């Protein structure tokens, strides 16, 4: 399970009866809580399958698991539309992660991308499926930051041959968005892999 906004000290590990949580944040002294933070929660029965854990920052974390092939899971947490200028660096890091791990097996990226992908984005590319969550009211106008986040997500997926998986499967409206603060635009969480989904 990939978690965002964990607000936990850097590189902490929390072990429970049935699962272990590995945290990553930007706090280097281990005493302060961060504004972001990502974590990956794993069943204890899978701990012996862990090949590597990379706590990169409070916005990125990677874990590789051994199976019949190596599965690499990346947890990404993009900045909101208030700070979209910080996202290109995260996307550069994501491209590097995909490049390093792609030959070993599936690379699955999930998290909170703070992006609003629309059905019109599906035209002309294979990254977006037919099951997007489109605006329902004119009052839900996208701001420039949200548009920038969307474009960066689409550019990344297209350039890397990834899909935005939750746009490829029919589901009710609620699972298409994960959170909507009153008066704001719905934000989507995406998972995508470099292999074709049939």
Where do the model's predicted regions map?
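A shared catalytic/ligand-binding motif for oxyanion handling
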Residues: 1-198
